Amino acid sequence: METPHCQRCGGRMEMRVRHGGLRPVCPGCGFVHFANPRVAAVVFLAEGERILLVKRKVAPEQGRWALAAGFVELGEAPEAAAIRELKEETGLDGVIERMLDLTFNEADKVIVILYQARAVGGILAGGDDVEEARWFTREELPELAFASTRRAVAAWLDGSLYSAASSRAGSSRNTSSRDSSG
């Protein structure tokens, strides 16, 4: 059990059947803890025939290249998280143009939202938890981290990334591959 004490009264949680499943419940105040998935916001930014990638400085996938991404913070809209992560990891200011994809990673219990963005300012430089941020052409692509990055780049390479977004609008896909933050 990941929540040993009640966040409301501090009492010891017990596993009980509630709302159709086995969940941590506080016998003192009746609070039920729901283990909800985390949400990751991922930014796909292309300029001409180049895409922006970041080299990860930390695990998971340390040393590999990925799209700028990170977890949505409490009270933050996913679009705002995407723009924040873009700035933190690349130094670039951006605007969201549209959502491209929505997937659920069953293994890590993460909802992954992929956004198309456009750079509107800033100076390209690696920051936060990345070693480097840089533009890559199709011919220069490095080894990629995360299934969501590999899917997005593959769709960009075959020309289906932007058309796929309109056909997937309102739908989501379930993935089981490891993809904890983008």
Give the predicted meaning of each segment.
Residues 3, 23:
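Residues immediately within or flanking Cys/His clusters that coordinate Zn2+
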Residues 15-20, 36-39:
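Short Cys/His-rich "knuckle" micro-motifs
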Residues 6-9, 26-29:
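Short cysteine-rich clusters marking metal-coordination/redox-active sites
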Residues 14-17, 92-100:
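A short coil-to-beta-strand element that immediately follows conserved catalytic motifs
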Residues 46-88:
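Conserved Nudix-box catalytic region and its N-terminal flanking loop in Nudix hydrolases
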Residues 27-52, 71, 102:
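Conserved N-terminal beta-strand and adjoining loop/helix that marks the start
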Residues 36, 101-124, 149, 157:
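Active-site-adjacent beta-strand/loop module that shapes the phosphate/pyrophosphate-binding cleft
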Residues 125-157:
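NUDIX/MutT-family hydrolases
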